[in-house]
Amino acid sequence: MIFPVTLLAFQWHRRPGGRALSRAAMEVAFRGVRKVLCVAEKNDAAKGIADLLSNGRMRRKEGLSKFNKIYEFDYHLYGQNVTMIMTSVSGHLLAHDFQMQFRKWQSCNPLVLFEAEIEKYCPENFIDIKKTLERETHHCQALVIWTDCDREGENIGFEIIHVCKAVKPNLRVLRARFSEITPHAVRTACENLTEPDQRVSDAVDVRQELDLRIGAAFTRFQTLRLQRIFPEVLAEQLISYGSCQFPTLGFVVERFKAIQAFVPEVFHKIKVTHDHKDGTVEFNWKRYRLFNHTACLVLYQLCMEDPMATVVEVRSKPKSKWRPQALDTVELEKLASRKLRINAKETMRIAEKLYTQGYISYPRTETNIFPKDLNLVALVEQQTVDPHWGAFAQTILERGGPTPRNGSKSDQAHPPIHPTKYTSGLQGDDRRLYEFIVRHFLACCSQDAQGQETTVEIDIAQERFVAHGLIILARNYLDVYPYDHWSDKLLPVYEQGSHFQPSTVEMVDGETSPPQLLTEADLIALMEKHGIGTDATHAEHIETIKARMYVGLTSDKRFLPGHLGMGLVEGYDSMGYEMSKPDLRAELEADLKLICEGKKDKFQVLRQQVQKYKQVFIEAVAKAKKLDEALSQYLGERTEMAQQEEIYPAMPEPVRKCPQCNKDMVLKTKKSGGFYLSCMGFPECRSAVWFPDSVLEASRDNSVCSVCQPPPVYRLKLKFKRGSLPPAMPLEFVGCIGGCDETLKEIFGLRFPRALPRASQPSGHLQASQALNRMDSSQHNLSQPLVNRHTRPSKTVAQALLPPTTAGESNSVTCNCGREAVLLTVRKQGPNQGRHFYKCSNGDCNFFLWADSSHSTGGGTPTSASGPPGSSVGCPSSVGSHMDGFGSLGSDSDGGTPCLCGQPAVTRTVQKDGPNKGRQFHTCAKPREQQCGFFQWVDENVAPGSFAAPAWPGGRGKAQRPEAASKRPRAGSSDAGSTVKKPRKCSLCHQPGHTRTFCPQNR
């Protein structure tokens, strides 16, 4: 279930940078604040921070989420005694996804996903957390964000802000910045609150949206196609794509292919050894090796002719082995993989756990420089109690204190990873990783190992050979850092100019070897070098390509590409797009940094990147057979696919914006046949335009209406059934249903809240109303003038002309005011007692419609009038007297009389006693409960349009009485000025000879 977050709640107007505020400004801002809501990224962090700020005197309460508790405590903040309400989220509170209509894989062509609307919503499993925040916000005057101080943490902070400010827009919002959960760090953060940094959050929004669009489009493309091409192998396989996944896979494939393409070469070299009482010294040839056997053999033979060695040089110099640099995230992942055999994902999971427990500083950092204001002495002192490395820590303090070896990188957010608290209670990999971080920190703060290196160079037949020896003078950091090795290599004493007989002089052969497969540490190093992902996401991308079976691991934990991974990379490479190369993603990562620095606009980056990947996608789909061919080399015979349309559904093209929700409305086909215009916001928005059954074909034209708003409103190519339109109207034409074409408004039953502006139409496009009016004026030459086609159409007729509805295809009943009509029941005794009807909810427009005829199953139109039950049925005001072809009120071409349904009327005879007994009349042929209310005497010559004439402009839709339309005597009267009393007329049909009680319409 999805709970969309109101877009207005996302409007955040603080300054983009996370600047610090002066204490005076903060004291002013906190005046009157009694309760402060504090939100951390995880429950453990919230508990730890609350415990430190309250000195252990916090009060725990249950939140609506059982995993996220609430901790209350009193605190003195900026001159105010306040109650702090500390709670947490569980990572990201909100998620990005496409709108509902795009989420099903078969709902659209994947290309649409590059432009489809995306919404940010709260997943169902986080709703309780969201409700907790909303509930607590009501009672608080300020909000302090305590999420992790990195990009993701900043973005999570803004998600919290959006939720809370939707409840209380004037809520004061501040940001706590810290790198470790220690008493000093959290109190310092409280005393130096800053503003949240919108720019950093924007960078995450851009990355999330691009990952969603690019990943979803390519994943659907690959999966849907390849599952059909290789059904036996990939029928159940998700073949995902990610702009970081593929370059990561590309590194593995590239190394594997380099090994495959490697051609070994034989080389030759001369080796000299000299035995002495302490061992054997090996002298290496200064030429190293030769690939020419003959040349090496000649030199070897020269050496063998006079094998006496002469010592030509003895050098001795100090040698240092550098201690490790301060630890950043990438180095932690690499070293843990190499030294501890813990993979990167598990390393970061454990490191996050140690951080929230307060044992180490924040583990996601690009910094390898300790800040000068960090108290390293206190951190070293904490470790002096340990039985394994405590003595070494004490030695550091006794020798002048810590002197860390710094690197050259800083993210200006967090210090290098270091221990913040001593513990001896950890077990398993938790203990091993904590010990590594402590030992690395102590080694970094110690001294380099010192030694003395001796180099001896000898000459044999003018060929030079060299040997190296080492004596370690001071181990220093090596005493605490067992992960590095440096051993003595003793040499006997050689005097310059002395001679000795080598023990062996031999020519040996060898062969060049290919590079090794990548280890996880190698892969992370390549990702960092080429800007693929961040220190926080390297492990995630590696795990993804393993889970998708794109790569596997050998027995010695090296990456080997699988058949699927190889085929995908080779397939895309054969298209000419090096999607497995890091360039595209590296550009994006660079742009994200520029967004964080305020040097690039988020929307500009989004547009550029979407367009770039969209173009690649279009061409990749066009060349998809190359992907099939590449994979067939690894997966076997493929199934031929004839048409692209067989795999992907056609893209719905937007026709206009929905008047209700402003989303696109697209042309769709009903299951039962026929067409309708549907809102892309379905099911949240159910706006639709149902086309009548007379429409045989409908498609979007590329021309845009210059009148209708909001633009663009595309015209439609329409084809109607023969006989459904007036004879002079073409059955095929291009028309607009945006509201400017009055006749199409009537045909399609369009209802608009207000009249649209009218303007001249571009030439070349025929409007239905124009064709109809030309037909009326040229062929019928009626004495009654046509109603102005610019007149706003009657809501009643718009409703009456709606097509028959089936299950799931309904339009709400709207009165002439544009409001939803109210459903009532006839209470008065009579033939219609108990019958339901619709009426204007405000009583403003005298709208009336029988409920049982609003959804006629017989294909007719519903009974609709502008009067109370039993009154005359009104004609549409915008159609007037030219209704031929749509159910004319006059005689049709073959002499029959159609009713309001457009069907031939039947002739009946009055059976009741009275003056009209035996008189014939025309009425609707349908059963009584479905009749449209049409009535006409057979012996009466009724001019077209005189029956229930159209409403006068401004007359609130009331039907005009025939006698009001003309005061002239009826045709056939011999004396126009006669004063003979007129007979009483029926109040229903306005005909003489009977009353309402005996009217055939009131049966």
Swiss-Prot record:
Active site: Y362
Residues the record lists as binding Zn(2+) 2: C899, C901, C924, C932
Tissue spec: Highly expressed in testis.
GO molecular function per UniProt: DNA topoisomerase type I (single strand cut, ATP-independent) activity; single-stranded DNA binding; zinc ion binding
Toprim domain span: 35-179
Description of how the protein assembles with itself and partners: Binds ssDNA. Interacts (via N-terminal region) with BLM; the interaction is direct. Directly interacts with RMI1. Component of the RMI complex, containing at least TOP3A, RMI1 and RMI2. The RMI complex interacts with BLM.
Name of protein: DNA topoisomerase 3-alpha
Organism expressing this protein natively: Mus musculus (Mouse)
